[in-house]
Structures are given as structure tokens and as C-alpha cells.
Amino acid sequence: MDEIHGEVSPPAINRSNGALVSDNISQVVEGVDNVERPAKVAKGYSAANRPPPELPHITNNVIPLSNVLKFYTQEAFKQITTLVENLASTKDSEDDSVRKKKFLELIIALRQDFIKIYTLVKWAANSKDVSRFIDLLNWLRMQEFYFDQLTFQLNALNGYSGAKLPNSDLITSLEVLFKGRPQLPSYNYIKIPKISPEKTLEVMQDLNLILMTRIALIDIPKRFINNYVIKDGRIYFSVPNEFQVSITVANDMIIESHDEYTKSPFYFIDFKFLFGINPDTSLITHRDNKIVTKLPRSSHENLEKIVNATLLNQGLHGLYDLLHKFSISFKLYLIAKQLKELQINTRWRNNLQVNYQNGKSLIILNYWSGQYLSKGWKSFIELGIDRNYNLNFRWFKNGKYNVNTELSALFNKHLKNTNEGEEEKDDSTDDIEEPEDLNVDLILNIVVNKHSELLMSKVFNSLDAKLNTTDNPDQISYITPHQLLIKSSPTKSTIFCINPLTGLFYFIDPCPVQNLIAKKINSPPTVVKNKNFVAESDMVNTIVDGLTQLRLEIFNKEIHNRLLTTEWINNDIIGLNDYEISRLSNFFANSLDYNLNVNKIQFYRRKNWPSSWFLINLVSGVTSVTFWWVARIKSVSGEWKIQWIQKLHLNEKTPSVEITDDPTNLNFEFFNNLSTACSNMIIDHMLLEELFKRNIKFLKVDNTALILQKFNIDKIPDDEDTQDTDDKNKPLIYESIIMIYNDNNLLPVYNSATSLFLKIKLINLNNLTQMKLKLFGKLRNLSIRNSPENFLQLNLKIDEIKNFFEIDDLINLSSRTNGSDSASSATTNHLLDKIFNNLNKLNKLIKILDQLNKNKIQIINNSVNDIIIKIDDNLDNLIIKLPEKATDSIKLISEEEVKDGGNPEVKLILDYLNKYLSNYYSDDFFANDEDKFYDGNKKTSIVGIIKYLKEINPILKSVQTIKAKLRKPESAFKLSNGLSKLNFDIKFTTLNLIQYVFHMNYQTPSSSKKIFKDKIVISLSFKNNKFDKVSKNLIKISLKDNLNSKNLKYKKLFELIFKSINDGSMDAHAHQLIKLNYDFLVNSSLVGELMVRIANCFVLYLQAESNGRYNQ
């Protein structure tokens, strides 16, 4: 593009529509390229006379269309030529269709390329317009670049301002024009004649007279009245404690009106401050002329210019306003300087921040800069000039400006006679009392002390309201306005203070807990840590919470130490959830808001306590009251659950135990008694819980004598082992009586009563805790053949004269609870096992004997452990062994089995009976029902079992007879290998199903070494005949189990069996046999004979078979 020279004419204005139209741009957009661009448009030349230059054409990265067509044409020709040559060379090796296919693929590929070229040619027909737009875009970008360069060059011209020539000296030219010569400086080479003293005195006196006249005729500021002196040709205005200024006039004109003042204004002569730094005290003093502060020369000259301008424009009123502001500002400067020194070299270091802003004439003092309530300019004092241009202050705290009349009075005392508008005192008063020095340190002390006092007052009121000290006023009291005496526990007090210098709280002679609480109090509250502003109420609440927490921690630590001293063991692993904690509040008479900052829960236990038993202690930091519970706590699915809990009732007395909830009585005796009371409660609960698990109804007896008298019991039996022991060696720890309801399960009511009594006594012997249990009550109508010595095995004593019994048990709790956790838990949960096992043995002994006697069953002998009875002459005596535990059942044993093993069938039957009794044993066992034996129901009785044994006795005798017969030589049939052809076995499937199993062994001619075995089963079961009251029980003989194809070979055997049964029905016992197809119902007295006959059939069958009468 050609370079553009010359100037650019402004755009033409279209008068018709007011739009600016650029001729050059419009021509370019219209595409007029052949018009030359004008070189100049100045000096009368028009822009339309010369056409603009052509747009430069862009040819970079542009490929001619001819080159593209040439390349693709040559490439297509080359590919066709190469393929034709290749196809000619593969004429013999490739199929003609394959060669044609390759040629077709090449033609299709070239066709696609030429379609693209065709599209490109069509597009090239319109490419001229596209190329022109590209050229135009390039030209516009170049124009933008040239304009940017023009801007840079124009800015560069500003750097040549120093090369300009100076302006002409018009003043000297005018002086030469009027005077004919310039007035050049003399440089003191021309001597000036001296003025005589008389002339000077005369002028001074004239000036004094003129000034007196001027002052008399004009209005002067209020604070200048009576505070000026005219002498030495000037007026001295003195504002007490602020400044002194001297002014004069330049001529002797008498000004009578304000409009003429500009003809003879006042002029500034001298100035000084009537205050300054006292070299003795380094404080700002206001002792008028005794200590003054003069300005440096440069400051004095600047002030002279400003004052003269002010006097010219505003007169004396403007002068006073200016110098009054200047004095107050300078005073602020001196105060700021003093504060800077305090900030660096005094005790205020790191506790004070000063922000002195010259432009605003304001000093901001941020005290307690290290305390979070004031840190970051949240509590400060502003010293500055108010709207009346007086030195004043504002106190900002708790997020707002505060007005404190007491603090304002103290400030005014130190700033008196400084501010405008204050009344001037009489001369006599000024002579007596001089103004005090302005002590910034004292002012700061006043502020921080007052703020500290206010904070401590709020803390006192809030803590007093929280602790509710109406009934106990000694909980909190004042020592000084900055110190509080707080009762941290019933026996200790602490002094809580605030440091006015730093604003931090602390304790005097602190312990580690107090140090932690002080650190917490001096830290921002957790609830407002994310806020920029912390209100004093939040701070006070944090302090009160911290002090409450301190009381809680100290009181809790005292209790903790005393518990540890008295051999309590702390458990800090247990943590109860909110639900479990809420269960504790159910015991409070008044609602108690559980808060970790107000109350604290601790868990303790004794070394000899059962596992999972704990003493829970809750200490209140508000009321200093302790709460105690005894609880059993276990971990369930990772969470601690309270299984049982009972509040420890204080202010109650038991033998040798007296505890109270008065915090002042938490001494060694209290905690020693606490251990005893808790242990008693645990033992008491464990006994009651064990009674509950045994489904025994009970009632704790408070008035023992009345209850015993009601049930005709004279008194509680005395302990023989404690009668001869003095109380010092075996002191009584705890004693209680529980009345137990006897619902005929513990003892027969016929022989006893509906109420039994359990006496519990805890004694301490040689530092070992023992529990003596005594179960006693009425007992009568006994038929036991035991001697008293025999009952000693059960710790049982029976007084048949008084119809009274008692069972004793002595348990060493120390040895039981000192074992391993699992062992101690198992033993301590079964404290009543022995005494109730003995009672259960007595109960069963009475009930079984009563049942046997009522059913006239012969009792051979009885003891506390077993009963020997006679069932039948053909059966051995039966021993009924009583269980050792209440949960066990009785056990039946044959007397012969004890001696020499006995009958195996009888032993098998008894094993079945014992197994059944262990599974289905119930109280119905002692029912007087002869028909209750095992018949498919889950009930039985001892009478039913005895009758069952009588009924099954013929079967057992038949089994013995069959076995004896088969052992005889004439019945012993052998195979070729010596094995018996017939084997007999008895099978007890259940007590109601007995099977006679006959095994038939044989050999086949084809396999003489192989033994085959067939089984023939005859089943016996008991059936109840409801229509016959005399002979109710029948025995069913069934042959249905043999109905199978394998037993067809034994047709002759079954014919013999049925014939034998039919022959038995022809005699006198025919009425006792009932035929049912393959089953027979017979009386128990006939079943033995029939089974022997059936066994003889097997022998007869084998004899006939051996004689060749039957073929397999």
C-alpha cells in the first residue's frame, strides 16, 4: 500500500438529515478502486478532484487455479498409465474380472477428485469479489495501524515543552517605558539613612492611638475582649491556654465602616502558643506565658502569609477562627507525639495503637489492642476537633459510640479553659488554681479502668443471675471494682480479675485448670469466631460459661480425687448418647438442662464389683449439687446402653451407713459410706433381678415385725454363726427381707403357705464381705423319712413342732467378684442358685412322695437326693434321683443298673424316659393322673411313667424269652459259612413304638459266597381304648411294614404267624385280641405270649426249610 501524505479533510455534513458522510470511506465501500487519492485537501483543493489509490492486492498463500488443474490432470494420467501397465503384466496370473474391478476402482477414485476440481472451478468464477474483500480488510487494518502511530507521535510532542523559549519580560519593558530605565537591585551598596529614636517613638505612639481608635470602632471576637494589650505600635491578643498574636496597621487611616476596611487592613506581626511541653514532667502544660512555644522561621513565614490573607478578607473574626483551629491542631499534634512515646517506651507497649490523621485533625486510640474485644479497632477513643472547633473526645465500644457522663466530667477537667464557649473564671480563682497539665497517660488509665469496671459489673450481674445466689450470697462478691471473689467449690474460693492495661482476665495464684479456663475466656467465643464483631454480651456470656465450667471442673476434681483416695476406679471410656443421658433427668425433682459446660458425668466402680456395674456421678457447675446413680451399663452394637439404673437416695440411714447430699459434707466418711450403700444396692438388685428371671413374684418388706406377725411367724431366726461374734469383728453392713409369693411351684401350698421369706444380710469379716441368705416359712404335713442330719446336706432345718423350715446359704462376695470378668459375671448372676436348688429339691421330694403315697406305690426308701420305689416283682427297683439344679429334671435309674449293669432293654427304656424328661419336663409331672404317660402329648407324670413301665414289662420279658430261645442249639440254624440264618433285635424308635426285627440270612446257588439278608419287622405301639374303662390301654401289633415284593418268598412264614395268632384267639383270652387286617389289638398281659409264638413261627419255618419242605 502506498504511503499517505497530506492532511485529511473533515467529513462532509449532509444538511438534509444531519449525518456525517465520509467521502473517502463511501468511495472505498462502493468499490471504486481506480480513483486516485488526493495528496492534499488544504489550500482550496477538493477531495473529489483526485481519485484514491488502488487497494494493494494480496497474493500471499494464493495458488493459481491453472496450477491446481495441471497437477490433478498429470496425476490422473500417471495413475491410469501405471494401472494399465500393471494389468497388462498380470494378464495370465489374474482373472479378468479382478483386473476389471481394479480398473473400475481407479476410475471411481479419479471421478471423485475431478468432482472436487469441478466445484473449485465453479467457485473460482466468483473469486474476484472474495479477493477484493480480502484486500479491503487488509487496507482497513493498515489504516488502523497508521492512526495508532499518529497518536504515539502526538504524545511524543509533549516531551519538547522544555525546549520552548521563555515569555517576554513585560514588567521590565513597562518599567523602561515609564521611568526610562530599569530599577536594578542595590545589594546594600547604597546606604539608607537611619531613623532616629524620636521618630520611632513618635510613630509608635501614633500607631497605639490609631489602634485604640480602630479597636473601639470595630466588632472584635468574644474571646479577644479583655484579652488584648496595645503597646509598641501593635495589638497583642492573648487567648488563655491557646495562643498570643500581635498585629498592626500600615497607615493612619481611621476606618469607620466595614467597607473601608480594605483600605487599611491589619497586618500580622508575631505569634506564639501559650502552651507547650513541660521540661520537668514532659507533659502538655497550659501555664500561659511561663511555657510558650514559638514557631520555626519557615512555619512563621507561611503563617504570616495565611494570616495576612485572612485579615484582609475576614478581619479579626477570621483571625481568631484560624488561630483557634491552629492551636487545637497543634495541641492534637503534641498529644499524638506523647502517645507515640507511650506506645514505644512505657507499659502501654503492645497494648496501644495510635492512628493520627493530619487531614482530619483526629487521633484514634485503640486500647487493649491484644484483646479480641478491642483488637482491630473495635474499642477506641477519638480525640479531635468537633463542629464548634473545640478539642473533644468520643468513646467507641461495643459497636457504638457511648456517652458516659462520669467519663466526660473527667475529660473536661483536664481540657478546661481549652475549648471555645467555656466560661472564664475570676482573676482571683486563676491566681489560686493553675491549669493542670494534660496527662494522656492519666486519660488512658481513666478510660481503661472505667471500661474494666463496666465489664466486671456485667460479669458479676450475669453470674449472679445464673447462680441464683439469693439463698447463698457468698457464691460471688466484690473485692475491688476489678476483682471478684468466686466460690469455685463448697470448700474453695478463687479471685477473678481483669487487667485494665491489657483487658485480659486472669486468676490470682491459678491452678492448671484455672489457666486453661483463663485461656478460654481470653479467646474469641466459638459461636462468633466467624464474625468480625464480638459484642460485650457475647464476651460476658463466654466468661460466665467459663467460670461455671471452672466451678464444675474444680468441684468435679475434688470429688474425683476423693473417690480415687477411697479406692474407687474411674472409667473414662464410657460415653452415653443423648437418649441415655435423658434417662438420668427423669430422676430429678426439677428439670435440669443437661449441658457439658454446666454438668459433668463420671463413671466409677469398685475393684470387687461385678462387671458392667458402675457408680454414675453428675456434678452441677451452677448449683454445686451432686447426683449419684448405681447402674449397669453394657456396650450394644458399639453404643453404651443403660440396662438398669437406680438413683442413690441420699439423706437416708441404714445400719452403719449414713450419707447426705450436702456438698459441705463430702468428706472421707461420706465416700466410705457411699461404697457400702452402692454395694448394697447392687447386691439387692442382683437378688431381685434373679428372682424376676425365675418368674418369682416378690415384695420388699419395710415393716418386718408387722409382716411376720401377720403370717404367724414369731421372729426371724437368729444366725448361729454370728451369735458368738462381737460387732467389732463382724459388723452388720446391710439387712433386708423380701417376701416371696409361693404359687405352688416353690413348695406345695398344702404343705406350706402362699408366702415365703428371704432374709439378706451383708456382714464384713476380716475385710471380706459375706452375704448370708436365709429362706424360711411355714412347712407342715410332711411324709419324709429323713433324719435331721440328712437335711443338713441341703442346709435345711425343719421344725415339725412349730411347722417351720429354713434354708441357709453363706456367700463370700469378695472371692466371687475378685475373679475374672467372665467368671465373676457368671457367679454373681446366680447368687440364689444354691438356696433355690435346695428348695427345689425339697419341693420335688415332697411332691413326688405325696404323689407316690396317694397312688399307693411302694416306697422302699427316700433321702434328700433320691427315692427308691418298687414297680413290679418282675422289674428291678426304680431309683428317682432328684435334680441338683432347679432347671434340671429328675432322673430314673434301675437299682440293678447301679449294682451290676441290669437289663439292657430296661436301661434303654429308662434312657429314653430320661431324655424325654429333660426335654419336656414341666410341673404337670407332679399331677396325680395315672393316665399321663407318653402318648404323643408333651406331658407326663411320675404315676404315668410307673404305669408305662408296668405296661411295657411283658414286652421286655418276651424279648428276654425270645433271645433265650434263639440261643438254644435246636434253634440255631447255620449257613455254609457258619453264620446264623436268623438274627433277632429289638428297636425302640420312640417310647410309643417298639419294633421286633427278625433278620433272615440266606445264600443263592449262583453266588454261594455272597450272603443275602431280608428283614421282617413286627411293630408294637400303645393305643388308648376310650370305650373300655377297665382296660383302657391296648397294644397294637402291626405287620404292615412287611408288605413288599421281597417278602413274597416268606409266604409260608406269614401263614404260620397268622395261624399262631389265630390259635391264641381260641383260648380264654379271645376277648382280649382284636383282628384288623394286618394289625392286631391285644391286651398288655397277652402281648408277651403272642410275641413268643411269633418267634416260634420263625423257628418252625427254618426247620421246615432245612428239611426241604420249602424252596427259596
Curated annotation (Swiss-Prot):
Pfam families with a match to the protein in the record: Med14
Keyword annotations of the record: Activator, Nucleus, Transcription, Transcription regulation
Keyword Metal-binding annotated: no
Subcellular location: Nucleus
Assembly and binders: Component of the Mediator complex.
Protein family: Belongs to the Mediator complex subunit 14 family.
Protein name as it appears in the record: Mediator of RNA polymerase II transcription subunit 14
